C-alpha cells in the first residue's frame, strides 16, 4: 500500500494512462481467478470424499459400515518423507468441524495442527466426513462412531505412553467434549480450539451473534429450513451466517485484496476458497439438536442433555486435561463462550480439583475465528507448543491454569531445556481470572432463558400448524433445486466453465500475463483507489456496528420485559443462574471416601513418593509449571535407568496422588516424608540434588519457594550436608 502524502498529488496524463492500463489488466486477471475458482468448485464438489488435507491419508474405519452408520470416517495421516514418528508417543487425532464446510482445515498445510504434531514425532489421525449425511443419522450416532474410532486408534498403538490427544476445532470441540463426558477412558489430553461451550455468554456491545436466535423467534426457522430441504439442512446457510458477521470482508475486502494483489495473491486465495466453497449437508434432525440443545438452549454445561438411554452428559466426568484455545478477536466464539462453561460447572478452583480436572486455557489477543486453526503463525506458536509439551500438560496437577508463551531470548535461563522458539509455562489461575474476560450478569441470563422458552413455544406451534403443510408440499427434487439456487453456490457457478460468457477470459488472461505492466507504487491514482477502498470498508463497518447495536438493544428490550418473563415462568427472585449445573450428592460421598484413603496412605511408599511430594510442595509456592522443569525430569529418567520404570500414566497418577495428599492435609503429608526416605544419607543427598536440579531449571528459587526448599532439605535430614549435584543438563536428549 503506498504511503499517503498530506498534500494530494495531481495525476498527470501519464499517471492516468498507466493506472488505466493496470486497472484493465487487473480486472481481466481478477476475472480469470474467478474462472479458476468456479472450475475448482465444480471439480471439488464432484469428488466422492472432497477434502483439503495437504497430506496423504489411508482409510482406517468407514463410519458407513458401522451398526449405526454415519457419514464419518477415520483416516491415518501418512507422514511425509523425512518425518520421524516415535511409536512410544501418544497419537494425535484431529476432529474437523462440520459447520457448513468440508473437512481438512486442520491439515490444510504444513504449518497446521497435523503438521506440528507430525513434526513433534506423533502419529496422526483425522476424523472427517462426507458431504452427504447417512439418512437418519443423529448427533448421538456420530458420537458413538467417534468412540469406535478412538478405540481403533488406541488398539493400533499399544506401546504408546498414554491415550490419544484429541483436537476438536470449532463445532467439533463440543462434539469431542460430549464424547469425553460419556467415555472419559478413551482420551488423553483434549485441545478445543475456537469451540463454543457456553452459548449465551458474551460482553455487552460485542459479539452479537448470540442474539440472532432470539431475534428470529428461536429454532422454528431451523425446522422450516430443514423441511424446505426435504429433511436435509443445507450447510451453505451456516456459511452465509458466518459471512454476515463481517460484511466489510464478505462484500469488499476479500475480493478487493485479490484484485489489488492479483499478481501474487491468486494461489492463496484459491487455496482458501477450495475449502470455503465446499458446502456440506446435515440431516434436519442433526441441526435441530444443535440449535435446540446447544445454541438456543445452552444445555451442555448445565448437564441437561441426555442420551437415548438416559445417560446425562456431564462435562465434570472428563478426567483428561482440557486445553482451551480462544481469541479476543474471534467474534464467532469469543473468550466468554469458550471459557464460561467452567463457571457454569464449578463454584471454585477447589471444586475443579475435587473433580480431578485439569483445565488449561490460553487467549490470543487478536486472531480471528478461522485463524485459530488456519493461521500458519498460530500453528508455529500455540499449536507447536501444545504438541511439544503435551506430556507436561498431561501430568499437571488438577486445577485451573493459563498457558503463557514467552519467546526464548538471551536472558532466558537454561535455554537448552527448551524445545522450540517459545517457553511454555502453565500459571495457576482462579475463577476470577475467567470472569475478568467479561460475561453475562443474572439479568442477561434471564433474558436468554426467556428467549429459549419462546423458541420452544414457537417450535411447537410450527410443528403443529405449519410443518405438516410444508412437508406435504416439498419434494426431494424441489429441495435440490432450491439448494442449487443458493446465492453462495451461484457465486461460484456464474464464473465457472459452464458460463459461455467466461469462455474468452482464460486466453485473454494469458496474453495479459505476457505483457503485464503494473502501475508504479507512487501513482497518485493508486493512492486514490486505496483511499476509496478504505472508505467502502469504513462505511460497511459503520453499517455492521449500527445493526449490531440495534440487535442487542432490541433483544434486551424484548426479552428483558418483566411481563414477558413472568408469562414464560422465568424465576426473577432466585440468585441462581438459569443454566448452572446442579451438584451431585454422590460425588460428595465419594470424595469423603477418597480423602479418608489419602490420609491413610500418606506414610506409604518410598523415595518416588517423597520426591514427588516435595517437588509439588515447593512448586506450589511458585504458582506455575515450566516446560524446562519437565524436561529436566525427562533427562533425569534417561540418566538413571531405575527411574524409567514408571510410564507416563503411572507418573501422572503418582503426581496426582501426592498433590491431593498435600491439599487434604499439608502438615501431615510433609511430616510423613522422612518415613519414605532411604536410610543412607548419600542416597538422600543424591535425591535432593535431583529435586533441586528440576526445581531450578526455570531459574533460581526465591521467596517462599526458596524457604520451602530449605524445609524439604531439613526433612531429608540434610541440613548440615552439601548435596552432590547431578549434572542432568549434560545428559543427551
UniProtKB/Swiss-Prot annotation:
Membrane topology annotation: Single-pass membrane protein
GO cellular component, one term: membrane
Alphabetized UniProt keyword annotations: Membrane, Transmembrane, Transmembrane helix
Localization annotation: Membrane
Recorded superkingdom: Bacteria
Transmembrane segments: 174-194
InterPro entries: AB_hydrolase_fold, DUF3141, PHA/PHB_synthase
PANTHER family according to UniProt: POLY(3-HYDROXYALKANOATE) POLYMERASE SUBUNIT PHAC
Protein name per its UniProtKB record: Uncharacterized protein in ackA 5'region
Organism: Rhizobium meliloti (Ensifer meliloti)
